[in-house]
Regions:
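AMP-binding/adenylate-forming catalytic core of the ANL superfamily
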Residues: 149-174, 189, 333, 340, ...
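Gly/Ser/Thr-rich phosphate-binding loop
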Residues: 310, 338-342, 351-418, 432, ...
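Structural core segment of the AMP-binding/adenylate-forming
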Residues: 137, 141-225, 344
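Conserved AMP-binding/adenylation subdomain of ANL enzymes
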Residues: 267-285, 295-339, 352-358
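Conserved pre-ATP/AMP-binding loop-to-beta segment of ANL
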Residues: 78-80, 203-206, 211, 215-248, ...
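AMP-binding/adenylate-forming catalytic domain of the ANL superfamily
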Residues: 201-207, 542, 574-599, 611-634
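Conserved AMP-binding/adenylate-forming core of the ANL superfamily
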Residues: 64, 82-137, 154, 158-159, ...
Length: 634
């Protein structure tokens, strides 16, 4: 690491943080030297025509080269690059860097043969199979821009993304497999194309043995057949500021936003993160138990581990029921995983089905050094459960689709800091996190406000929203000039630790008091009978809003629901005060969630308020909403 700024009595973290804060160009120039450029950047930071900071604008490189070819050139071609483990099909497969490079080069050739070139968009609608990662890397190889959509997403949502991205081709598979259910993808893709005003020229279909798709001879291509005839394609040089991908994230209103990621800043930031945040050596085994359709899958299944020369794991399964709550621990044991990264909801599911950690005891986790969590607030009961059962450090960190890597975390490769439950620790070097009030003034420690990032944002953060720069300006930059507004509320404590209390929308107003539902969830979720919970603000004529709790019990727990409600009401009252007006907690079998594990609080609130609502496209199981309606009718 660097020791660039400040006196000798400063910690390693403080030195690194201040170097990045005070001399961002010098700091990021040093980090950029850790990747293999075709032409090294002479300019480190420059504003574009919209006044947005762009990193390494004259650097020339290729992300697929960094992830694959570079390691082969360095004599690491026989090292394991990717392990595919699929409990839903019983398949397991390992790819070396050379094998992965050769297959990606041929898929790039297969795309090129259909006219796909630099700057073209390609929609990737795939299950969690190796070909999904290969498709992404093949696009990167050509300088084409991939837009990955969760496999199985509803046709109308896929259609909206097709219309916005205007892809030349779509890459899909015949089906996905959810636990034991086969979901044919082809009818969903056909319907999306039919509904979209934009028509892609070709659709590549990867035929899986579990289900064969019928092809439309005019438009569809058999992936395996095209691959067998394809010639390998070399890496196309691109500018650091050329887009690598578009990833759609749900907007609070209207159509989804296409977050644009550039090539150079992304590669530099991810390479830095693997050592600074995750402390993984080259050749280490990194497992992000996520999906390639989500930003964590983009950054930490596909790009960062491969750029860093690690082994990455692509897991086609779930934390539970594939076949049991020991799935995560089996994978960690079998492949000697160094670091595991998933969302708190995955561990809550494991805890619910195996509260005593019986399955975990069957596996050897001696190789596992750290467990990282992100994607939603890590509630202290989940943190404590995972820590006590695994005896491993559990590290919460906070970031967004928009940034592509962590904004705040425990930088284990620079300096491991003491963990504070409920906090994602401190800002990562490169980010300046400030808490602002409604007027844009910084607030005192321990005071809640808008979590904002002072510009310039570090490399990898979005420079715009795809074909809608106004939306980028109004959604993120215009509220407080000179800052990027994250949309989250939270506070910094007296030690500079960041506490994210949830989306600004999750702050409720009870009789003029602004209260965080996240804080209430922390208290409710701390009850020994409860596996997970959600608190939403519902309309009240007298007080404006009142909090309402929904709780899921741990498996096997039997309680008197009224008595439990009384205990929870008492708990919130004693810890927040009567001002919270927390009076009701309803027991449900499960909470409605997105496929990436976020609880759909807004939809729950709309149902509770009797409002019209649309079923979110990102929902994992729409029938979970009926459950909420049912308990509210009681």
């Amino acid at each position: 690491m660097s020791g660039h700024t400040g006196g000798s009595n400063m910690s390693s973290y403080e030195k690194e943080y201040l170097w990045a804060k005070n001399e961002p160009e010098s700091f990021w120039r040093a980090q950029a030297e850790n990747i293999d450029w075709f032409e090294s950047p002479k300019t480190i930071l420059k504003s574009d025509e919209n006044g947005i900071e762009r990193w390494f604008p004259d650097g020339v490189m290729n992300t697929s080269w960094l992830a694959l070819d570079y390691h082969c050139e360095q004599g690491r071609g026989d090292n394991t690059a990717l392990i595919y483990d699929s409990p839903v099909t019983g398949n397991k497969k390992t790819y070396t860097y050379r094998e992965l490079r050769d297959q990606v080069a041929k898929i790039a050739g297969m795309l090129s043969a259909q006219g796909v070139e630099k700057g073209d968009r390609v929609v990737v609608y795939m299950p969690m199979i190796p070909e999904a990662a290969m498709a992404m890397l093949a696009c990167a190889r050509l300088g084409a821009i991939h837009s990955v959509v969760f496999g199985g997403f509803a046709p109308n949502e896929l259609a909206v993304r097709i219309e916005d991205a205007e892809p030349k081709v779509i890459m899909t598979a015949s089906c996905g497999i959810e636990i034991s259910k086969i979901i044919p993808y082809k009818p969903l893709v056909d319907k999306a194309i039919m509904d979209s005003r934009w028509k892609p020229e070709k659709v590549f279909v990867f035929q899986r043995p579990e289900c064969e798709a019928e092809l439309n001879q005019e438009r569809d291509l058999d992936w395996q057949q095209e691959y067998s005839q394809a010639l390998p394609h070399a890496c196309v040089p691109v500018l650091a500021t050329d887009p690598l991908y578009i990833l759609y994230t749900s907007g609070t209103t209207g159509k989804p936003k296409g977050v644009v990621r550039d090539n150079g800043g992304h590669a530099v930031a991810l390479k830095y993160s693997m050592s600074a945040i995750y402390n993984i050596p080259q050749g280490g085994v990194f497992w992000a138990a996520s999906d390639v359709g989500w930003v964590v899958g983009h950054s930490y299944i596909v790009y960062a581990p491969l750029i860093h020369g690690c082994t990455t794991i692509l897991f086609e399964g779930k934390p539970v029921r594939t076949p049991n709550p020991g799935a995560f621990w089996r994978v960690c044991d079998e492949y000697k995983v160094d670091a595991l990264f998933s969302a708190p909801t995955a561990f809550r599911a494991i805890k619910k089905e195996d509260p005593e950690g019986e399955f975990l005891k069957q596996y050897d986790l001696s190789n596992l050094k750290t467990i990282f969590m992100a994607g939603e607030r890590l509630d202290p009961p989940t943190l404590e459960w995972v820590q006590s059962k695994t005896d491993k450090p559990v590290i919460d960190h906070w970031w967004q689709t928009e940034t592509g890597w962590a904004i705040a975390g425990n930088p284990t490769g620079i300096e491991m800091m003491p963990v504070k439950a409920g906090s994602s620790t401190k800002p990562i070097p490169g980010y300046q996190v400030e808490i602002l009030d409604e007027l844009g003034e910084p607030v005192k420690p321990n005071q809640q406000g808008f979590v904002a990032l002072k510009r310039p944002l570090p490399p990898s953060c979005l420079p715009t929203v795809w074909r809608n720069h106004d939306r980028f300006e109004t959604g993120y930059l215009s509220q407080f000039p000179g800052y990027y507004v994250s949309g989250d509320g939270g506070y910094l404590d007296e030690d500079g630790y960041l506490f994210i209390m949830g989306r600004i929308d999750d702050v409720i107003n009870v009789a003029g008091h602004r209260l965080s539902t996240g804080e209430m969830e922390e208290i409710v979720g701390g009850h020994p009978a409860i596996a997970e919970c959600a608190v939403v603000g519902i309309h009240d004529d007298l007080k404006g809003q009142l909090p309402l709790g929904f709780v899921v019990l741990k498996d096997g727990v039997k309680v008197d629901e009224l008595a439990l409600e009384g205990e929870l009401v008492g708990k919130v009252r004693s810890e927040i005060g009567a001002v919270a007006c927390f009076k009701h907690a309803l027991v449900v079998d499960r909470l409605p969630k997105t496929r990436s594990g976020k609880i759909l609080r807004r939809t729950i609130r709309q149902i509770a308020d009797g409002e019209q609502y649309t079923v979110p496209s990102t929902i994992d199981d729409p029938t979970s909403l009926n459950e909420i309606e049912r308990v509210l009718r009681r």
